[in-house]
Regions:
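Active-site beta->alpha loop and helix N-cap motifs at the rims of alpha/beta catalytic domains
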Residues: 1-63
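Short N-terminal secondary-structure initiator segments
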Residues: 22, 29, 71-74, 207-215
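Extended, intrinsically disordered, low-complexity segments
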Residues: 179, 183-240
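Catalytic alpha/beta core domains of metabolic enzymes, predominantly
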Residues: 38-185
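Alpha-helix-loop-beta-strand connector modules within alpha/beta enzyme cores
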Residues: 1-4, 22-27, 104-123, 190-205
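Acidic-enriched, low-complexity/disordered segments with a strong bias for Aspartate over Glutamate
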Residues: 14, 61, 80, 85, ...
């Protein structure tokens, strides 16, 4: 089973710690990341020298993703030992942006034959989902968002399915129920069947009751007749 060592995304600190890990675990072929443009020399050289795989990370941009791979290759790292982290967004605008960039990376690699982008992609989804406030809001603070436990699990599961469809090959997830739902989706794609047969989320917290009807605004059933627009008639002037 491959072991992924993920840093704290502070380039200077990651370089210091991950270099030491590369040395200590020589020959174990760990997956080391995130490696950014700011620290690619130190971590890249250590990973290459001690036989590890690198996660090249860039901030949701096709050109920057390619640039980091080029820098690593110039350093002497084989692109066969590189996994691309395009940077992962949670649900909402962040997910759509990441999804779009991943599609463009795939298109550049497959249709344009760009050999600097023909690498598997990884998404650190759990980190992004579980740190956002929507995943942590209680029923008292946000009753309109529904059951807090199911909400956060579904946020991670929906993100996982979306990134798989965008071409992700490795998903870093946290909640067992989210992982179960993602695996069920893979099985449905591979073997067919109905999503109705997928086991529901197993709750570990107390169930909650939410009266959504009481939160809905009063229905306005007033029918207002639309005013007809006045027809402008242009006056024709006869020329002498």
């Amino acid at each position: 089973v491959p072991l992924i060592i993920w840093g704290c995304a502070v380039p200077a600190k990651d370089e210091e710690v991950l270099k030491k890990i590369c040395e200590t675990c020589e020959g174990e072929n760990l997956i080391i990341g995130p490696v950014e443009e700011k620290n690619h020399k130190g971590i890249g050289a250590a990973a290459m020298g001690y036989g590890h795989t690198i996660i090249s990370s860039s901030p949701i941009d096709v050109n920057l993703a390619k640039q980091v791979n080029i820098l690593l290759e110039n350093l002497g790292v084989s692109l066969d030992k590189v996994i691309v982290d395009p940077t992962t967004g949670g649900l909402g605008y962040g997910l759509e942006y990441s999804y779009s960039v991943m599609e463009r990376l795939t298109q550049a690699a497959m249709t344009q034959g760009d050999d600097k982008l023909q690498n598997p992609m990884i998404n650190n989804l759990g980190n992004e989902v579980w740190k956002c406030k929507e995943a942590k809001l209680t029923i008292e603070n946000a009753p309109e968002l529904g059951d807090p436990e199911r909400r956060a699990i579904l946020m991670e599961a929906v993100g996982a399915v979306s990134y798989m469809l965008a071409g992700s090959r490795i998903l870093m997830m946290r909640h067992p129920e989210s992982i179960k739902l993602a695996k069920a989706f893979i099985s449905l794609l591979a073997d067919g069947g109905s999503a109705m047969d997928v086991a529901p989320i197993t709750k570990r917290l107390d169930d909650v009751e939410i009266d959504f009807a009481s939160m809905a605004p009063a229905a306005d059933l007033t029918i207002v007749e639309e005013k007809k627009k006045a027809v402008k008639v242009a006056s024709l002037k006869e020329e002498d």
